[in-house]
Curated annotation (Swiss-Prot):
Membrane topology: Single-pass membrane protein
Species: Oncorhynchus mykiss
Keyword Lyase: no
Stated family: Belongs to the cytochrome c oxidase IV family.
Source species, domain of life: Eukaryota
GO molecular function, one term: oxidoreductase activity
Annotated localization: Mitochondrion inner membrane
Cellular component per GO, a single term: mitochondrial inner membrane
Summary of subunit composition and partner proteins: Component of the cytochrome c oxidase (complex IV, CIV), a multisubunit enzyme composed of 14 subunits. The complex is composed of a catalytic core of 3 subunits MT-CO1, MT-CO2 and MT-CO3, encoded in the mitochondrial DNA, and 11 supernumerary subunits COX4I, COX5A, COX5B, COX6A, COX6B, COX6C, COX7A, COX7B, COX7C, COX8 and NDUFA4, which are encoded in the nuclear genome.
Coarse class of the protein's main subcellular location: mitochondrion
Function according to Swiss-Prot or TrEMBL: Component of the cytochrome c oxidase, the last enzyme in the mitochondrial electron transport chain which drives oxidative phosphorylation. The respiratory chain contains 3 multisubunit complexes succinate dehydrogenase (complex II, CII), ubiquinol-cytochrome c oxidoreductase (cytochrome b-c1 complex, complex III, CIII) and cytochrome c oxidase (complex IV, CIV), that cooperate to transfer electrons derived from NADH and succinate to molecular oxygen, creating an electrochemical gradient over the inner membrane that drives transmembrane transport and the ATP synthase.
Gene Ontology BP terms: oxidative phosphorylation
Protein name: Cytochrome c oxidase polypeptide 4, mitochondrial
Pathway in which this enzyme or protein is active: Energy metabolism; oxidative phosphorylation
């Protein structure tokens, strides 16, 4: 997590579109 990112416990990170 960071700015424009969503940390998922699934295994990694998913970048939020746009945000």
């Amino acid at each position: 997590x960071x700015h424009g990112e969503v940390e998922v416990s699934a295994x990694g990170k998913n970048l939020s579109p746009x945000v």
